[in-house]
Amino acid sequence: MRNTKKVIAAPAAVATLVGLAACGSSNDNGANKGDADKAELVFWGWDSGNSMKEILADFEKANPGITVKFNNTGTAEKTSTALSNAIAAGNGAPDVVMLEDPTVTQFAVTDGLVDLSEFGADKLADDFAAGPWNKLQYNNKPYALPIDSGPEMFFYNKAVFDKAGVDGESIKTWNDYYEAAKKIRATGSYITNLAGTSNDYQPFTAQIWQAGAQPWKVDGENITINMTKDEGMQRYIQFVQKLIDEDLVDAKTPNWSDDWNRELNDGTLASLTIGAWMPINLMTGAPDQAGNWRVAQLPQWEEGKEVSAEDGGSALAVTSQSKNQAAAYKLVEYMTHGEGAQTMADTGTFPSLKKILRSDSFTDPTTESNKKTNDYFGGQNVNEVLSAAAQRPTEKFQYLPYNPYAQTAYGDEVSKAYSGDITLEKALENYANKLAEQGKQQGYNVTVK
């Protein structure tokens, strides 16, 4: 039975999270749909675009019988921890919660979230980009709706590429990328960094996703881990090991470190494969390279293909503890599929809704925000490239129901391959064994191939 799974709560000593639980829904597990037009909702999330006040005011105006109390958790990690505590306690969860996409499965599998197909969300599938939509399914049912997305992109420094005699626009396949890496290394720069820390986990999942890998499969109580024999994983392992062996990547500098920003700013790192939300981070982290960076579609494993993958993204869900589920879903749909989605996009959130991605306003180079970004990217229409990527097809990809552990364990084990202690294949074998052990501790039947 699914309720045999352990819900691991974080230490209750974290005062801010205890406070959040106190501000959660006072309802117990006898949740029901409630009145769709009259409710007092509690909503946990973060507000990176500073748009929440406007969105919720507009929602309440359109739904005069519903009020929303927004508790700003500050970060995705704090939100997940607080929700874990509330589920473990059996009370205190909000009506609506914002989550990072990879964590949705862990809460769905423990019955912490509502299957949104009960409210017709499954009929919205074609309205969203495939990548973010596919990530939020559990047992082929939507347990959250995407509020933003992060299609994986190829960002490159044209000045560094030009110095190496490489045309960035000519890189269509990963073999092209490998050949470019050799030329760039000869100039003293690296084509990119790969350090294998926990900060590199999301790019790792995006890269294996695009390679068609299925390193783990979750089927109810059963988890199958196939970390090194899976065809897509072998494709990825052999390619990355070649980059490591030939010293073509900076294997010491982790993403988001001070050294990482310094190397992006001085040209040591010539490119990144990372989510579409990256432009603002380059603009602030590598100001000296203004005018030099460009963005292109992700290189492909097979020539002529147009397969994408997701790196990051967040979503809105309705909790099982809520007794206002119908009204809560109204808010979720408004923010992800209704007018609130446009407001989010207007304030800098990268959209997941196709109609916004295809809109003239999103790619209009004359808007203040777009002009600033395009100037940094040498006059390129950045959103036009990003929009095309978001609408590319993606393979289906699952996350483990204990994804936070998977991220930490990835850094513990895989970093050893980048430091040269062991091969990447051996590191991933060790990683698979740790994932299996954790799954068994949580009550799953785990098979390692």
Language model segments and positions:
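A structural signal for short loop-to-beta-strand junctions that line the ligand-binding cleft
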Residues: 93-95, 124-160, 304-309, 392-400
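Short, low-complexity disordered leader/linker segments with a strong preference
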Residues: 1-41, 61, 426, 433-449
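Short, well-ordered beta-strand elements
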Residues: 35-47, 66-71, 95-96, 143, ...
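Glycine-centered hinge/linker elements that transmit conformational signals in sensory
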Residues: 181, 222-253, 298
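Conserved C-terminal helix/tail region of periplasmic/extracytoplasmic solute-binding proteins
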Residues: 162, 386-449
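C-terminal lobe and pocket-closing loops
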Residues: 278-289, 302-408, 446-448
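Extracytoplasmic "Venus flytrap"/periplasmic binding protein-like
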Residues: 58-128, 163-165, 263, 267-271, ...
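Hinge/lid segment of periplasmic solute-binding proteins
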Residues: 101-152, 178, 207-208, 294-296, ...
